[in-house]
Amino acid sequence: MMDIKQIQEALPHRYPMLLVDRILEASDDEIVAIKNVTINEPFFNGHFPQYPVMPGVLIMEALAQTAGVLELSKEENKGKLVFYAGMDKVKFKKQVVPGDQLVMTARFIKRRGTIAVVEAKAEVDGKLAASGTLTFAFGQ
């Protein structure tokens, strides 16, 4: 388990782009994290004021950050940056709204050199909200 201070040690992201609140569990290849979605999120001001919905691209960013915590916490990757190299099979199944808690799972399925591939999903109340295969490239 990791708290927000430990997450900030691993990730370079800060408010308003830090989208992981807590790590619930982690192994060598899999990590589970949460994001508590509140009405105070800056993106709700414009998406949409009358019906606030978390943008799908930010759900995918939260999943990427979840995977990033796992990799950037490893001694050999400390201080490196990780960049999106691609997304495949992305599906949005459920709207994420203020008051929801996203439970995010990322599982590494392939690592080769500076490239990593992750299967990721985000759930709310046990129901799938979003999923996809994410590809990352590690910078120096």
Swiss-Prot record:
CDD domains: FabZ
Active site residues of this protein: H47
Family matches, as SUPFAM superfamilies: Thioesterase/thiol ester dehydrase-isomerase
Catalysed reactions listed for this entry: a (3R)-hydroxyacyl-[ACP] = a (2E)-enoyl-[ACP] + H2O
GO molecular function: (3R)-hydroxyacyl-[acyl-carrier-protein] dehydratase activity
Top-rank taxon, per record: Bacteria
Gene3D superfamilies with a match to the protein in the record: Hotdog Thioesterase
Swiss-Prot/TrEMBL GO biological process terms: fatty acid biosynthetic process; lipid A biosynthetic process
Cell location: Cytoplasm
GO CC terms of this entry: cytoplasm; membrane
Family annotation (Pfam families): FabA
Keywords for this protein: Cytoplasm, Lipid A biosynthesis, Lipid biosynthesis, Lipid metabolism, Lyase
Known function: Involved in unsaturated fatty acids biosynthesis. Catalyzes the dehydration of short chain beta-hydroxyacyl-ACPs and long chain saturated and unsaturated beta-hydroxyacyl-ACPs.
Family the entry assigns: Belongs to the thioester dehydratase family. FabZ subfamily.
Protein name according to UniProt: 3-hydroxyacyl-[acyl-carrier-protein] dehydratase FabZ
Organism whose genome encodes this protein: Streptococcus equi subsp. zooepidemicus (strain MGCS10565)
Phylogenetic placement of the source organism: Bacteria, Bacillati, Bacillota, Bacilli, Lactobacillales
